[in-house]
Amino acid sequence: MATSGDTGVDVLVQPFREALNVLGFEVYPLKIGWYNAVVSQAHQLQYSADTLALVVLSTPSMFEKVFLPFLQKNCCQGVRDPIDQCVAQSINSCVSECLHDQNVEISFDYEMLPSRKPKFLAQSAAHVAGAAYYYRPSDVQDPPWGNKKMFGVCIHPRLGGWFAIRALLVLKGVEVGEALQQVPPPNCVSSREARIELLERFNLRWKEWTYRDIIPVEERYSLNKKSISLHLQTSGGSC
């Protein structure tokens, strides 16, 4: 069983990260123990606490760099969700190229277990990896919505809500030591008022996409991306 410090993590992960960065993705390392510490027992992953994992996000540039060419090649005929297929092909290709000597288990955000639970909780994984802050109703004192069911949402420090959490990769047998330290995600929606606004936009007005701009952002989806994503949502796909 391999044991890797921070330098070893960089050596192992950097080629994979660079290959996906070119395609409009971001990659963040984490330990399985960080993830298991914040989810219920039913959602915990059955690996040792020091096992290395990677969470993969897509940025707005992925749409132009990867997805539009994917559509133009007519790769999605008969496919229920072409974005999911495009993302899966991109990640699998980079794993084959850069992590071919590792035993990698890939879980995509849309995959479910036989119990109908998701294979992993995407927003929790992104939060503990330091990629994006997961804002939940419990983060608001005396919420104005009372007992109404409200869902949480992740906000990226540069992209706001203009990104998606796509996959969790577990590198089986690769354990990282204390050199890999957990860094909390930037708390970019810090006030109670802003958090209320964020959660209300996300839960009550999600079709407007305004929650994505709760902070100033560096990139946004193009109009074509929004049109295609809304079409996919109405037909059962995802963005």
What are these regions (language model features)?
Residues 1-239:
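Auxiliary alpha/beta "docking" domains used to position bulky ligands
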